[in-house]
């Protein structure tokens, strides 16, 4: 689907390869509806974080949890994609995932706090 070609994860991977020190936050698990391609191109990069906004409704809970673990829990931020989506629903979808309480707390705030403080 060419509508999403500008958010194709390989484009971001090329930028990150060209500028290795660049810190990047990629929305929608690195590429909306291209989640497998996203983690194939982007997972394992220590200077990349993804958010889970506007994605959890379209993934089965175990698929979403698998994506989170592929990127690494500490590399994932909670995002609501407000005003497009209801933050309460996005939060409920995150809390319904098969994740530990500690993993959820990391995604909800700890990871972003560390990122803002330069610790992430």
Locations of regions flagged by a protein language model:
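Mid-to-C-terminal alpha-helical segments outside catalytic/metal-binding sites
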Residues: 72-77, 84-120
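Catalytic pocket-lining loop regions of alpha/beta-barrel enzymes
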Residues: 1-77
């Amino acid at each position: 689907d060419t509508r999403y070609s500008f958010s194709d994860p390989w484009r971001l991977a090329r930028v990150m390869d060209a500028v290795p020190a660049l810190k990047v936050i990629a929305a929608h698990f690195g590429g909306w509806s291209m989640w497998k391609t996203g983690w194939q191109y982007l997972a394992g990069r220590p200077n990349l974080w993804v958010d889970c906004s506007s994605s959890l409704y379209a993934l089965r809970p175990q698929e979403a949890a698998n994506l989170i673990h592929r990127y690494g829990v500490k590399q994932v931020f909670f995002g609501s994609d407000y005003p497009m989506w209801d933050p309460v629903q996005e939060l409920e979808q995150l809390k319904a995932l098969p994740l530990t309480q500690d993993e959820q707390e990391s995604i909800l705030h700890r990871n972003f706090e560390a990122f803002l403080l330069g610790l992430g």
